C-alpha cells in the first residue's frame, strides 16, 4: 500500500486537502439549500487558507464556484488526489438519511481508495467521546482521534466542518454527543475539538489586521472584511431564481429561499406558530413572557426589544436623518423612506397571487389577502361584531367607551382616531398642496386629488357585478350595493331605525334633538341640515340650474332632475322582492315596502289612528289642529294639503276656459 502523500508527512495543509468533488448523479441528489451550503463552505475554507498564506493561487474549483457554475463538471485532473485525515468519532445521529451517507462515502472512496479503505470509513459506532478516551488524557487523547500532527488536526477540523454543516443543513438545531471538555481560561466556553479551542484563543491573541478603507473599521478575519465591503459596493452576487432579489451573502440567499419553499422549521411550543428563521422564533417567544426590559428614560415607555427602543428614541430627538433626494422630505426611520420612495417610482413589489393586484407595502398586501378569505377573526366582546383586522377592532372599541383621546390643540375638537386628528389639523393651516393640472383645483389630500382626476378622465373603475353600473369611487359602489342587498348597517339608538349610509344616520339624529342650526338669511327659516338650506335658497333666487336635455325642463335640485330623467328612459331600478312591483324613486319604494309588513308605526295621539307613513300622520294631524298651511292669496283660500290647493287651482282655470 502506498504511504501517505508528501504534503501530509510534512504537516502542511493545502486546498486539495479540504476539497470534495461530486459526480453529476451525486450533485443532483442534493437540494438547492445543500448545494448552496456546499459552495459557501468551500469558499470559506479557501478564504481561511488564503488568510494563513497557504493558498498561493486560486484553484479552478473556487473560480467555478464564485461564478455560480456547477462543480461536478470540473475536469478530473483539476481535482485533488490526496486523502483527508478523517475524524473517526463522527456521531451516528449526524447522518440525516442513509442515501446521503452513501453519496459521501462514494465521493471520498472514489478519490482516495488507492490509499486504503481502513482510514477512510466514516465510523458511526462512536456513541460518546469516552469510547475513544478523548477525555482520558486530555490533549494526547484527542490527538489519538485526530492524528498527532497539528496540521492534521486543523485539516480534520475543516473536514468535519464540511460534513457537519452539510449534513445538518436541514436541521433547526445541531446536536453533538461528545462532552465539551476543553475550557478556555479567559471565558467559560466549552469546545468539542481542540482546533476549536485554538481558533477561539486566536480571538484574544490576533490583532484586528483587516481594516476597511472606507470607514476604518477593523476585523479579525479577511472573510468578515469581504462581507463588510459589500455594504459600500452594493455587490449582490447571489441571485434568487424564484424572486428577483439579490442578497449580498450566500447564507442570506439560502435563508431567503426557505421563504419560497414555504418551509417553517422553527415552531413555538407555546402557541404552535411556526417560523422559517430561528431568530424570528426567539423574537416571538418574548411575546408570551410579556417582559419589556428596555425602558425609555425620556417618557418611561417600555419595549420588548432594544432595537424598538432605539427607534423610539428618535421621536424625542426629532432627528430625521433619512432624506428623500426626490422631494427633500425627511424621515425618522430608513424603512419609512424606503416606502416613501415607492410613491415616486410607482414600484409595487408585493403582488397578490389570488387576483394579481400589486402593493407598495407588505402590510397592505397582508391586509388585502383577507378580502379573498373573508375571515373575520377579531371579534368585539361588547357587541359581537367581527372584523378582519386587529387595528379595526381596536378603533371600534373606542365607540363603546365614547372616549376621544386625540384632541386638537387649535380648536379643542376631540377624535377617537389619530389619523382623523392628523386629517383635521390641515383644515386650520388651510394648505392645499395637491393641485389638479387639468382645472387648477387644489386639495388638502393627495387621495382626494386622485379621485378628482377621474372626473376629467371619466374613468369609472368600480363596477357593480349585480347590475353592471360603474362608479368613479369605491365608496359609491359600496353604498350602491346596499340597494341590492337591502343592508342597513347604521342603526339609530333612539328609535331603532336603520340606514344604509352613516351620513343619513347622522342627518336623522337631528330629528330627535330638534336642533335646526342652519338658518336662511333671506326669510329667517331654519333647517336641520345644510343641504336642505342650500336647496331652500334656490326658492328666493328662482334659479333652476339643472336642465333636462331631453325636454328642456329645468329643476332646482339635481336629485329631482335624476328622478325626472327616468320618465323619459322608463327606468325603474327599485324592485320589490315581495310582489315584483318596480319604482323609479327609492323613497317611493321605501314607502311601498311598509305595506307588506302591515306595521303602522305612526300613531295619532289625539284619536289613536295609525298610519304607514309619517307624512300621512302629519297631514292627518291638521284635521285636529285646523292648520291650513297651503294658501291661495289671490282668492284668500287656505288648505291643509298641497294637493287640495292644486286641485282647486285646476278647477278654477277650467271654469275660466269654459266661459
From Swiss-Prot:
SUPFAM superfamilies: beta-beta-alpha zinc fingers, KRAB domain (Kruppel-associated box). GO terms for cellular component: nucleus. Residues 13-84 form the KRAB domain. The keyword Metal-binding applies. GO terms for molecular function: DNA-binding transcription factor activity, RNA polymerase II-specific; RNA polymerase II cis-regulatory region sequence-specific DNA binding; zinc ion binding. A zinc finger (C2H2-type) spans 210-232, 238-260, 266-288, 294-316, 322-344, 350-372, 378-400, 406-428, 434-456, 462-484, 490-512, 518-540, 546-568, 574-596, 602-624. SMART domains: KRAB, ZnF_C2H2. It is found in: Nucleus. May be involved in transcriptional regulation. This is Zinc finger protein 254. It comes from Homo sapiens.
Amino acid at each position: 500500500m502506498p504511504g501517505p502523500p508528501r504534503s501530509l508527512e510534512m504537516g502542511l495543509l493545502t486546498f486539495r486537502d479540504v476539497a470534495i468533488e461530486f459526480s453529476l448523479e451525486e450533485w443532483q441528489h442534493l437540494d438547492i439549500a445543500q448545494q448552496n451550503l456546499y459552495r459557501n463552505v468551500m469558499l470559506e475554507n479557501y478564504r481561511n487558507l488564503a488568510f494563513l498564506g497557504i493558498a498561493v493561487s486560486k484553484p479552478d474549483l473556487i473560480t467555478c464556484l464564485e461564478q455560480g457554475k456547477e462543480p461536478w463538471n470540473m475536469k478530473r485532473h483539476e481535482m485533488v488526489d490526496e486523502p483527508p485525515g478523517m475524524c473517526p468519532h463522527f456521531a451516528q445521529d449526524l447522518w440525516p438519511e442513509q442515501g446521503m451517507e452513501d453519496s459521501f462515502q462514494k465521493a471520498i472512496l472514489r478519490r482516495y481508495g488507492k490509499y486504503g479503505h481502513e482510514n477512510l470509513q466514516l465510523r458511526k459506532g462512536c456513541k460518546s467521546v469516552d469510547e475513544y478516551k478523548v477525555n482520558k488524557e486530555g490533549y494526547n487523547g484527542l490527538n489519538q482521534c485526530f492524528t498527532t500532527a497539528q496540521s492534521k488536526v486543523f485539516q480534520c477540523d475543516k473536514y468535519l466542518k464540511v460534513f457537519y454543516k452539510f449534513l445538518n443543513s436541514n436541521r433547526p438545531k445541531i446536536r453533538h454527543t461528545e462532552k465539551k471538555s476543553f475550557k478556555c481560561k479567559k471565558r467559560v466556553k466549552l469546545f468539542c475539538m481542540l482546533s476549536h479551542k485554538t481558533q477561539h484563543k486566536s480571538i484574544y491573541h490576533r490583532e484586528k489586521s483587516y481594516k476597511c478603507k472606507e470607514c476604518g473599521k477593523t476585523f479579525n478575519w479577511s472573510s468578515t472584511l469581504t462581507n463588510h465591503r459589500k455594504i459600500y459596493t452594493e455587490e449582490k452576487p447571489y441571485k434568487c431564481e424564484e424572486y428577483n432579489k439579490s442578497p449580498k451573502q450566500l447564507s442570506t440567499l439560502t435563508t431567503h429561499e426557505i421563504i419560497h419553499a414555504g418551509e417553517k422549521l422553527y415552531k413555538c411550543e407555546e402557541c404552535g406558530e411556526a417560523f422559517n428563521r430561528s431568530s424570528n422564533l426567539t423574537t416571538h417567544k418574548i411575546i408570551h413572557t410579556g417582559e419589556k426590559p428596555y425602558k425609555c428614560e425620556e417618557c418611561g415607555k417600555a419595549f420588548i426589544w432594544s432595537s424598538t427602543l432605539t427607534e423610539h428614541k428618535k421621536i424625542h430627538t426629532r432627528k430625521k436623518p433619512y432624506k428623500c433626494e426626490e422631494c427633500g422630505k425627511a424621515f425618522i426611520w430608513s424603512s419609512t423612506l424606503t416606502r416613501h420612495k415607492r410613491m415616486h417610482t410607482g414600484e409595487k413589489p408585493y403582488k397578490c397571487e389570488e387576483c394579481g393586484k400589486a402593493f407598495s407595502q407588505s402590510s397592505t398586501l397582508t391586509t388585502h389577502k383577507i378580502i379573498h378569505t373573508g375571515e373575520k377573526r377579531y371579534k368585539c366582546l361588547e357587541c359581537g361584531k367581527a372584523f378582519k383586522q386587529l387595528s379595526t377592532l381596536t378603533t371600534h372599541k373606542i365607540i363603546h367607551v365614547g372616549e376621544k383621546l386625540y384632541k386638537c390643540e387649535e380648536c379643542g375638537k376631540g377624535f377617537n382616531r389619530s389619523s382623523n386628528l392628523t386629517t383635521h389639523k390641515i383644515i386650520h393651516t388651510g394648505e392645499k398642496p395637491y393641485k389638479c393640472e387639468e382645472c387648477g383645483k387644489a386639495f388638502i389630500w393627495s387621495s382626494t386629488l386622485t379621485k378628482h382626476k377621474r372626473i376629467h378622465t371619466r374613468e369609472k373603475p368600480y363596477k357593480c357585478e349585480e347590475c353592471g353600473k360603474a362608479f368613479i369611487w369605491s365608496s359609491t359602489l359600496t353604498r350602491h350595493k346596499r340597494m341590492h342587498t337591502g343592508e342597513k348597517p347604521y342603526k339609530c339608538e333612539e328609535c331603532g331605525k336603520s340606514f344604509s349610509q352613516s351620513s343619513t344616520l347622522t342627518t336623522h339624529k337631528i330629528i330627535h334633538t330638534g336642533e335646526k342650526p342652519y338658518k336662511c338669511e333671506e326669510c329667517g327659516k331654519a333647517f336641520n341640515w345644510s343641504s336642505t338650506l342650500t336647496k331652500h335658497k334656490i326658492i328666493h333666487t328662482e334659479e333652476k340650474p339643472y336642465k333636462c336635455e331631453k325636454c328642456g325642463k329645468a329643476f332646482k335640485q339635481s336629485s329631482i332632475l335624476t328622478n325626472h330623467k327616468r320618465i323619459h328612459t322608463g327606468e325603474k331600478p327599485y324592485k320589490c322582492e315581495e310582489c315584483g312591483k318596480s319604482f323609479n324613486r327609492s323613497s317611493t319604494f321605501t314607502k311601498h315596502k311598509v305595506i307588506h309588513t302591515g306595521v303602522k308605526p305612526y300613531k295619532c295621539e289625539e284619536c289613536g289612528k295609525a298610519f304607514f307613513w309619517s307624512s300621512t300622520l302629519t297631514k292627518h294631524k291638521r284635521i285636529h289642529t285646523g292648520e291650513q298651511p297651503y294658501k291661495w292669496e289671490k282668492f284668500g283660500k287656505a288648505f291643509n294639503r298641497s294637493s287640495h290647493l292644486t286641485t282647486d287651482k285646476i278647477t278654477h282655470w277650467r271654469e275660466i276656459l269654459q266661459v
